[in-house]
């Protein structure tokens, strides 16, 4: 599978405050970004997979809501995470 527990742990260690901090906005955004990039590659090959396309749009919306939350609460954390992950504003 493309996202196993070891990969999740690695993402949480890198972007969260610790390996067990799975609920921070940064770690969730990093996880969503990884899943979005994987689904984007999948859709390049399987362009008629409409169920995956819908789930991709839902993930992008979830990530957008988390980014909006970061803008409201701490703009510096927002700027750091979009720079680190290469997300457009």
From Swiss-Prot:
One of its GO terms (cellular component) is cytosolic small ribosomal subunit. Keywords: Ribonucleoprotein, Ribosomal protein, RNA-binding, rRNA-binding. One of its GO terms (biological process) is translation. PANTHER family: RIBOSOMAL PROTEIN S15, BACTERIAL AND ORGANELLAR (PTHR23321), SMALL RIBOSOMAL SUBUNIT PROTEIN US15M (PTHR23321:SF26). Transmembrane segments: none annotated. Belongs to the universal ribosomal protein uS15 family. GO terms for molecular function: rRNA binding; structural constituent of ribosome. Part of the 30S ribosomal subunit. Forms a bridge to the 50S subunit in the 70S ribosome, contacting the 23S rRNA. Pfam families: Ribosomal_S15 (PF00312). One of the primary rRNA binding proteins, it binds directly to 16S rRNA where it helps nucleate assembly of the platform of the 30S subunit by binding and bridging several RNA helices of the 16S rRNA. It comes from the Bacteria. This is Small ribosomal subunit protein uS15. InterPro entries: Ribosomal_uS15, Ribosomal_uS15_bac-type, uS15_NS1_RNA-bd_sf. SUPFAM superfamilies: S15/NS1 RNA-binding domain.
């Amino acid at each position: 599978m493309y996202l196993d527990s070891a990969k999740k742990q690695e993402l949480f260690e890198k972007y969260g405050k610790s390996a067990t901090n799975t609920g921070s906005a940064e770690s969730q955004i990093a996880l969503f970004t990884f899943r979005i990039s994987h689904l984007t590659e999948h859709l390049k090959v399987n362009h008629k997979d409409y169920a995956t396309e819908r789930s991709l749009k839902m993930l992008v919306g979830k990530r957008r809501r988390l980014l909006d939350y970061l803008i409201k609460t701490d703009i510096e954390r927002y700027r750091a995470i979009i720079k680190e992950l290469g997300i457009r504003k």
